Curated annotation (Swiss-Prot):
It is found in: Cell inner membrane. Its main location: membrane. F-type ATPases have 2 components, CF(1) - the catalytic core - and CF(0) - the membrane proton channel. CF(1) has five subunits: alpha(3), beta(3), gamma(1), delta(1), epsilon(1). CF(0) has three main subunits: a(1), b(2) and c(9-12). The alpha and beta chains form an alternating ring which encloses part of the gamma chain. CF(1) is attached to CF(0) by a central stalk formed by the gamma and epsilon chains, while a peripheral stalk is formed by the delta and b chains. Key component of the proton channel; it plays a direct role in the translocation of protons across the membrane. Keywords: ATP synthesis, Cell inner membrane, Cell membrane, CF(0), Hydrogen ion transport, Ion transport, Membrane, Transmembrane, Transmembrane helix, Transport. It comes from the Bacteria. This is ATP synthase subunit a. One of its GO terms (biological process) is proton motive force-driven plasma membrane ATP synthesis. Belongs to the ATPase A chain family. The chain crosses the membrane at residues 34-54, 94-114, 115-135, 143-163, 171-191, 218-238, 244-264.
Length: 273
């Protein structure tokens, strides 16, 4: 007897898992009316987990011999604070906690990539929601909309600190006068606008590209395991294990790089040309 639903091909499987649970189908390359609900949900979820993580660390903090959890959190806080001290020369009252927030949040969002790729598809099918939630992606940083949103937040902070430190007049003067003098004001303005845009776009694209590639490789490994052969299953287990171990480095390295670039860009606001 024929089955009701034929098994998807490899390309259909990948395309399905790279789709988003959105407010509507995307027909154009750029459509600001579309909201990826899965990206928003998992971003908030990672943020809540991060806040709970730090709250528990603060609650359990002791001046005596720290436990493993407190020691791990203290290592992260000290690492971030040392990086902030070496990069930002000025008041770091807000910047160091900001960098810590960025690192923990991005690391947690990246870590969602370790969840099995078919886990939520199977869950939605089991509870009868597969007809409503036809697509679902778990990793917010594998969505360019998510990384661009964070990068735009960093861009807003760059502008804020430039105005706060140099004053509105000083910031505008720097836009027109640096780096080649006021006589080349139009060229200076264009160059500075390109610099701000390049920083924002590259910050978003770097994180997105690495996490998207990692997610795609996990899908390919899952396809390898779906082959009905002993070799396919063995290759799936070996490749999946090795890539998951290597991906741990990528997850936290990308969070560290994003945090460092955030510090560098905000730290540049404390300097004048």
């Amino acid at each position: 007897m024929a089955t009701d639903h034929a098994a998807p091909t490899a390309s259909e499987y990948i395309v399905h898992h790279l789709g988003h649970f959105s407010t509507k189908h995307q027909d154009k390359i750029v459509d600001f009316s579309i909201i990826n609900m899965d990206t928003i949900f998992w971003s908030i979820f990672a943020g809540v987990v991060g806040c709970l993580f730090m709250y528990l660390a603060a609650r359990k903090a002791t001046s005596g011999v720290p436990g493993r959890f407190q020691a791990a959190v203290e290592m992260i806080v000290e690492m971030v604070d040392n990086q902030a001290k070496s990069i930002v020369h000025g008041d770091r009252t807000f910047i160091a906690p900001l960098a810590l927030t960025v690192f923990v949040w991005v690391a947690l969002m990246n870590s969602l990539d370790f969840l099995p790729v078919d886990m939520f598809s199977a869950f939605f099918h089991a509870v009868g929601l597969d007809s409503l939630i036809t697509h679902h992606r778990v990793v917010p940083t594998a969505d360019l909309n998510g990384t661009m949103g964070i990068a735009l937040g960093v861009f807003a902070l760059m502008i804020f600190y430039n105005i706060k430190i140099k004053g509105a007049g000083g910031f505008v003067h720097e836009l027109f006068a640096a780096p080649f003098g006021i006589w080349l004001a139009p060229f200076n303005l264009l160059l500075n606008m390109i610099e701000f845009a390049a920083k924002t776009v590259s910050l978003a694209m770097r994180l997105f590209g690495n996490m998207y590639a990692g997610e795609l490789l996990f899908l390919l490994i899952a396809l390898l395991g779906s082959t009905a052969t002993a070799f396919g299953f063995f290759g799936h287990v070996v490749a999946g294990t090795l890539w998951a171990i290597f991906h741990i480095l990528i997850v936290f390295l990308q969070a560290f790089i994003f945090m460092m670039l955030t510090l560098v860009y905000i730290g540049q606001a404390h300097e004048s040309h």
